[in-house]
Amino acid sequence: VEFFGAKLLYVVDTHTHADHNSACKLMRERYGVKVVMHRATDAPYIDVRVDDGDEIRFGKQALKVIYTPGHTQDSMCLLFNDRIFTGDTLLIGGCGRTDLPGGSAEQQWDSLRRLQALANEFRVYPGHDYREAVSTLGDEKQKNPRLTIASRDEFIKFMTSRKPPLPRKIQEALEWNRTPIYRQRGLGEGI
């Protein structure tokens, strides 16, 4: 922020994270920004709660909110011109897991189908880049194994049969991300 001389207005979390601590509270304190999340979140420190179809305006630009529950109950994606920021709803070559608190394979199927209805040209920027940092919806529709599953029942069976290990610090992350008060622990701690 300092390097570019940028003025931050908002910090947006696409969902409540169970795998790491969000930096929203730290950024709010340091830069005076408003924290934005979907209205379904149970995080108490949110300044702006958005819903499907809302716009997060900055200058003459806006991010359009698409509510995409499934990975979590408060998951959302953000459309900006020819880009879509998918959080953990859609990953490159995969999608967010649905076995963590608030996850639903049924809702994830519905949310992914909603994203599939968008134009192939949208560039996809996921919350995690396990493979690459950017893709297109067209490539994901063709190559992403989660998007090529033909039926809802088959998708739900696949997602509910997967039992990856829980995130190592799930309890710590959920507590941090659902606690209203930022507790000063020293610069960088808690992120």
Spans of model-derived segments:
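Catalytic core of the metallo-beta-lactamase
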Residues: 1-8, 45-126
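Histidine-centered catalytic micro-motifs
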Residues: 11-21, 68-73, 125-132
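Active-site HxH/HxHxD metal-binding segment of metal-dependent hydrolases
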Residues: 1-65, 142-143
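Accessory terminal helices/loops
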Residues: 110-123, 127-191
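Residue-level signal for the nucleotide or nucleotide-sugar donor/cofactor binding architecture
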Residues: 22, 102-103, 150
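Short secondary-structure transition/capping segments
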Residues: 32, 58-64, 86, 90, ...
